[in-house]
Swiss-Prot record:
This is NAD-dependent glucose-6-phosphate dehydrogenase. Homodimer. Keywords: Carbohydrate metabolism, Glucose metabolism, NAD, Oxidoreductase. NAD(+) binds at N90, S115, Y152, K156. One of its GO terms (biological process) is pentose-phosphate shunt, oxidative branch. Pfam families: Epimerase (PF01370). GO terms for molecular function: glucose-6-phosphate dehydrogenase activity; NAD+ binding. It is an enzyme of class 1 (oxidoreductase). The gene is azf. Gene3D superfamilies: NAD(P)-binding Rossmann-like Domain. It catalyses: D-glucose 6-phosphate + NAD(+) = 6-phospho-D-glucono-1,5-lactone + NADH + H(+). The keyword Oxidoreductase applies.
Amino acid sequence: MDQPVLLTGAGGRVGQAILGHIGDAYDWRLLDREPLSDEKIPDSVDSTEVYVADVTDETAVRNAMDGVHAVIHLAGDPRPEAPWDSVLRNNIDGTQQMFDAAVDVGVEKFAFASSNHAVGAYETTDRTPDMYRPHHEFRLDGTELPRPSNLYGVSKAAGETLGRYYHDHHDISVVNVRIGNLTQHHPPKEYERGQAMWLSYRDCGHLFECCIEADYDYEIVYGISDNDRKYYSIDRARAVLGYDPQDNSAEFTFEGEPLDEA
């Protein structure tokens, strides 16, 4: 791919998982509201391609966006307990600003980092904790309506809806990735819910690489590894994006140790 890929929120965990996997595979532009330390920037990325800016800054966003082919939009307030004024500014207004700039400069693909919190209220007391265990039949597949568990989840559902609007009215390809529980090296320890929605760094990088490479219109997919215990379906991500996850929380003990070492 000759044109750059813009990655917002590049210094966060998801951004670092992506860059750790495919940091040398693309011509990146990186944007974060905080200066990135050298270890967070791939060697192949020139300092002129690193932007320190807020996604609500229209001028900065458009400068960073100019000439890019694809956008991976991660930036925002990631706190589940974030108050409304913060999610409104950073997650909703900021995402709208990103979409608006993207269509103005002719971006072809836009991958939006949604969240499990956009559907967290499906985890009702009559379903939990059984739904976190292997062989339970309950599945969310991306066709269900949002059911947020907090205001952060509301903001992510709003981002998905913004994507629907911009796809329908401006023909930009949009994929919303409802990210599960991203941890490095091993699944969350002694946490059934986290192990059911575990996303490894390796699979995270691969999934967003698929978002850059695949052809799609408007999609909602789940971002988890191929866990035995799961209540999110990854069938759509496999079929549309070519996602082929390699990791499985069942390959670790409940305490997070690899089974072949336990």
